[in-house]
């Protein structure tokens, strides 16, 4: 099966780089699924995005992403994010508290984290 080269980078660190069979996320114009040989595009991610990376024979990666951009070429997907964290790094109770914040940016980050751990859709 053809694969995508995926790189997810936050301001403070490289989050993940590797091969994937499918990538799903949300942009400002809607949800998007990327398969190998996708048409090239650049899109802005929503502030409460969750990125799901499907890999051949391995568990899916779920990553909470706070804003950023998605760049797609025929073989490569690059995500540049303000911040990002794996679902395994997320404290669900802290994410729930953040999601209820009056600050829209903090609330968006909390929702992204809850999506990554599978607590909300």
Swiss-Prot record:
Give the record's keywords alphabetically: ATP synthesis, Cell membrane, CF(1), Hydrogen ion transport, Ion transport, Membrane, Transport
Asked if Transcription regulation is a keyword of the record, the answer is no
Described by its record, this protein's role is as follows: Produces ATP from ADP in the presence of a proton gradient across the membrane.
NCBIfam families registered for this protein in UniProt:
ATP_synt_epsi, PRK13442.1
Q: Which residues, if any, are the signal sequence?
A: none
Q: What family classification does the UniProt entry report for this protein? A: Belongs to the ATPase epsilon chain family.
Q: What's one GO-annotated cellular component?
A: proton-transporting ATP synthase complex
**Where is this gene product found?**
Cell membrane
- Name assigned to this protein: ATP synthase epsilon chain
What is the protein's membrane topology class? Peripheral membrane protein
Known InterPro entries for this protein? ATP_synth_F1_dsu/esu (IPR001469), ATP_synth_F1_dsu/esu_N (IPR020546), ATPsynth_dsu/esu_N (IPR036771)
Q: Name one GO molecular function term.
A: ATP binding
Q: What is said about its interaction partners and assembly?
A: F-type ATPases have 2 components, CF(1) - the catalytic core - and CF(0) - the membrane proton channel. CF(1) has five subunits: alpha(3), beta(3), gamma(1), delta(1), epsilon(1). CF(0) has three main subunits: a, b and c.
Q: Which gene encodes it?
A: atpC
Under Pfam families, the record lists: ATP-synt_DE_N
Which PANTHER family does the annotation name?
Answer: ATP SYNTHASE DELTA/EPSILON CHAIN, ATP SYNTHASE EPSILON CHAIN, CHLOROPLASTIC
């Amino acid at each position: 099966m053809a694969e995508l080269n995926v790189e997810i980078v936050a301001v403070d660190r490289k989050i993940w780089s590797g091969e994937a069979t499918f990538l799903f996320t949300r942009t400002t114009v809607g949800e998007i699924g990327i398969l190998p040989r996708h048409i090239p595009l650049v899109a802005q991610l929503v502030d409460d995005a969750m990125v799901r990376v499907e890999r051949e024979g391995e568990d899916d990666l779920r990553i909470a992403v706070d804003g950023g951009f998605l760049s797609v070429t025929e073989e490569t997907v690059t995500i540049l994010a303000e911040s990002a964290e794996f679902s395994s790094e997320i404290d669900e109770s802290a994410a729930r508290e953040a999601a209820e914040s009056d600050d829209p940016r903090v609330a968006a980050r909390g929702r992204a984290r809850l999506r990554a751990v599978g607590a909300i859709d």
